[in-house]
């Protein structure tokens, strides 16, 4: 019976080769487009190492800072470490809270008297390794004592280790990062660039650089750090947001003439991916609309090709 179906199909294809070719190519392109959309969505929101807990993550990257009596005066951007620590680190509801530099930075790494290698560096705190799940090939992440001391230790990816030393067995060795000496405490498997908030090739303590105290604007409220919150469950999201508001209000009691605007943050992972600037709302509806239109269009195109 199955052989008969195949014979009938081949017979129909031979009757009109041009229309059959158009139908097959159109259907294939439609399926390919749907696969691209699904893969894009999966890369945007589906958990994968080291962002293994995307579904339980809340993200705070930008804030607004303004006079209460003059809303026309406003600063927008990332906050300082001082602000992030006061407003988020004392939270009781989450499983973990990490503060990192807002963006990875390109630096030059080298062995003493060796060739320089350009690499992506992210500055993080000790809780970073609780929020993001890295595959350590050797060694370990730096701990709270290391972070509090501002020690110059680093976790590096396997590919950078091989570029610098010719081997991945480098725990305990020292290298130069923008001319500052760092000791390697751990080596991890290379991270995909699709892991937008965890990606780097070298991770160092935020406290080992001036980013720890860097700020701009009035009173050191604004700076260059982001906050990533790991909830115990998605059900805890409302409680975490309420606690964030309470800590923000307590912090701003010291600055009675100003407001710190969260603009509906912290965001879920998908919403954060649609927030492109500090002072504009995330384009969530537009993103969802685009995905739906693309799916409907490709579905219609496939139907037309088959007909």
What is each PLM-predicted segment?
Residues 63-77, 86, 98-127, 141-153, ...:
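Short acidic/polar micro-motifs at solvent-exposed secondary-structure junctions
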Residues 15-44:
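Short, strongly hydrophobic transmembrane alpha-helices
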Residues 297-305:
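Conserved small/polar residues in nucleotide/adenosyl-binding loops
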Residues 5-14:
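A short amphipathic helical element positioned immediately N-terminal to and/or at the very start
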Residues 122-142, 152-284:
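Mid-to-C-terminal secondary-structure elements
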Residues 37-108, 115, 222-226, 234:
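Membrane-proximal extracellular/periplasmic loop immediately following the first transmembrane helix
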Residues 282-296:
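N-terminal membrane-entry
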Residues 4-5, 19, 39, 43, ...:
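Short, conserved clusters of charged catalytic residues that mark active-site
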């Amino acid at each position: 019976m199955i052989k008969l179906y195949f014979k009938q199909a081949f017979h129909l294809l031979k009757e009109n080769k041009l229309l059959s070719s158009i139908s097959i190519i159109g259907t294939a392109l439609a399926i390919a487009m749907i696969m691209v959309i699904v893969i894009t969505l999966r890369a945007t929101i589906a958990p994968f190492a080291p962002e293994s807990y995307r579904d339980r993550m809340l993200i705070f990257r930008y804030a607004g800072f303004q006079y209460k009596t003059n809303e026309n005066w406003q600063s927008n951007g990332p906050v300082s470490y001082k602000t992030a620590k006061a407003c988020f680190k004392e939270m009781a509801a989450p499983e973990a809270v990490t503060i990192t530099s807002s963006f990875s930075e390109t630096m030059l790494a080298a062995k003493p008297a060796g060739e320089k290698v350009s690499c992506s560096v992210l500055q993080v705190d000790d809780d970073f390794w609780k929020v993001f799940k890295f595959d350590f090939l050797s060694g370990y992440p730096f701990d709270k004592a290391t972070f509090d001391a501002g020690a110059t230790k680093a976790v590096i990816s396997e590919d950078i280790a091989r570029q610098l030393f010719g081997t991945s067995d480098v725990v305990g060795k020292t290298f130069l990062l923008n001319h500052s000496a760092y000791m390697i405490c751990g080596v991890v498997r290379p991270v995909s660039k699709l892991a937008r908030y965890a990606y780097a090739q070298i991770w160092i303590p935020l406290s080992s650089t001036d980013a720890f105290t860097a700020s701009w604007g009035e009173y050191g409220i604004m700076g260059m750090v982001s906050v990533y919150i790991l909830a115990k469950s998605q059900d805890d999201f409302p409680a975490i947001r309420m606690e964030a508001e309470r800590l923000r209000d307590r912090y701003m009691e010291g600055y009675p003439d100003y407001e710190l605007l969260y603009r509906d943050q912290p965001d879920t992972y998908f919403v954060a991916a649609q927030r492109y600037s500090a002072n504009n709302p995330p384009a969530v509806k537009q993103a969802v609309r685009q995905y739906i239109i693309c799916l409907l269009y490709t579905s219609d195109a496939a139907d037309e090709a088959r007909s």
